Regions:
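Active-site hotspot residues in diverse enzymes, especially metal/ion-binding acidic/histidine motifs
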Residues: 1-196
Length: 196
C-alpha cells in the first residue's frame, strides 16, 4: 500500500479537470515517491521508473496479446483477482505495442487508478471515452514527461536541434515516450508556456 497515493486520493477528484493542476500534481507525486528511500525509485536520466512506481502502488503487471488489437491495457482492482494473479490490483498491457506505448499505457491506467477508482468498490475498465479520458491522458503525459524536466529537456535539445522532427525524436528517446505523446506534450507545455 502506498500511503502517499492513498492520501492524495482523499481529495475530491470527481470534477478535477484543471490541466495545469494535474501537471503540477503529477510532478509533486512523482517527486514525493522518488524521495522515499524505502521505495528505491530512481530516474534513469530523465526517464521515469513507471513500472517500479506501479509495483510500489501494489500492482502486478502482466503483458498479453489482446483479442482486440485496439486494446492497449486494462486495469482491475478486486479481491477476485487474488487467486489468478496473486494480487487484488492488476494491470495487463498489450504486448503488441512498442515499449514507449506500453509505458504510456501504464501511466494512463495509473491515472484511472488515482482519479477514478474507489477503494470501497471493485474497479475494472478497458474501454472508456469521455472527459475522464482527457484527464487520464493529461496525467499520463505529465507523469511520463514531468513538466519541469520536459521544459528543461526541450530548452536544452532545441538549442542544438533546429529540425522539429529530430527534436521530437530526441525528446521521445529522452523520456522513453511515444513520439505522438511528445508532440502533444509540446503543445501542452511549450506552446502554452511560450504564449505567456
Amino acid at each position: 500500500m502506498c500511503i502517499e497515493i492513498e492520501n492524495y486520493k482523499q481529495h475530491d477528484l470527481f470534477n478535477y479537470f484543471d490541466y495545469n493542476q494535474i501537471d503540477n500534481d503529477a510532478e509533486d507525486l512523482l517527486n514525493t515517491l522518488l524521495n522515499i528511500s524505502e521505495y528505491n525509485l530512481k530516474l534513469n536520466k530523465r526517464r521515469v521508473p513507471v513500472m517500479e512506481i506501479a509495483k510500489v502502488l501494489g500492482f502486478n503487471i502482466y503483458t498479453t496479446k489482446f483479442n482486440d488489437y485496439n486494446v492497449k491495457a486494462t486495469i482491475g482492482i478486486s479481491n477476485q483477482l487474488i487467486n489468478k494473479y496473486k494480487s487484488n490490483k492488476v494491470i495487463i498491457l498489450s504486448s503488441e505495442y512498442t515499449d514507449e506505448e506500453i509505458l504510456f499505457s501504464l501511466c494512463y491506467e495509473l491515472a484511472h487508478y488515482i482519479y477514478d477508482s474507489n477503494p470501497s468498490n471493485e474497479y475494472s475498465h478497458t474501454y472508456r471515452i469521455n472527459d475522464i479520458e482527457l484527464r487520464a491522458i493529461r496525467f499520463a503525459d505529465a507523469l511520463l514527461m514531468p513538466i519541469t524536466s520536459f521544459k528543461e529537456a526541450y530548452t536544452e535539445l532545441s538549442s542544438n536541434i533546429n529540425n522539429q522532427e529530430l527534436l521530437i525524436h530526441a525528446l521521445s528517446n529522452t523520456f522513453n515516450a511515444p513520439q505522438v505523446v511528445v508532440q502533444r506534450r509540446i503543445k501542452q507545455v511549450i506552446n502554452t508556456y511560450e504564449n505567456h
